[in-house]
Amino acid sequence: MSDKLKQFKLLIVLSLFLLAIPLYFTYNHFRQSSALKESFEKNERIEVLHRLTSSEKYASDIRKAGYTIPSDGAIRLDGVIYPLEIEGDLHLKISPPKEDAKDFQLFFITQVNEKQTHVAFILDKNLNLIDSSYSQQNDNGKREIVSVSQSEEDYLLKSVQSEIDAFMKKMYQTLYG
């Protein structure tokens, strides 16, 4: 009788253990998903970008929303989604921000003074410009740093801000309906 009781207790402990494993993973998935929604609602753009691009977890949702990202194999190989492409007026390429980052980088190509210009922006959490870089190809085929007018930079910044805001709204709609 004692043997059957021990077996029964062991069976209960084993069942509880096996039940706890999927519950843990379900809870962890829910916690991560709710943290992303909370970041969206608090308008923490860098945190949202980090969570969306830090793994392949949201890759299908990003594609479903109409944005261009690398293949799943490339994402697994790199460990992040790089680049996240927003194909608006400027065709932005966003680098994935690191965890707890205070800023993030993006790149695009545009026309300045009728010449193709490569642009790099570093933006803070409020999409304010921290730093910028502009380069054009010279007659020798080498890239050289150029400067642009303040009005041109302001115009480009406003365009970038509106495209990122539109991305945030569309991703929120895609994920949370």
Q: How should each PLM-predicted stretch be described?
A:
Residues 82-177:
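Extracytoplasmic electrostatic interaction patches
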Residues 13, 31-34, 162:
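Basic, mixed-charge low-complexity alpha-helical segments
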Residues 9-25:
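Hydrophobic membrane-insertion alpha-helices, especially the h-region
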Residues 9, 31, 118-120:
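Compositionally biased, intrinsically disordered low-complexity segments enriched
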Residues 1-7:
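Short, Lys/Arg-rich N-terminal segment immediately upstream of the first membrane anchor
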Residues 22-100:
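N-terminal export/targeting and maturation segments
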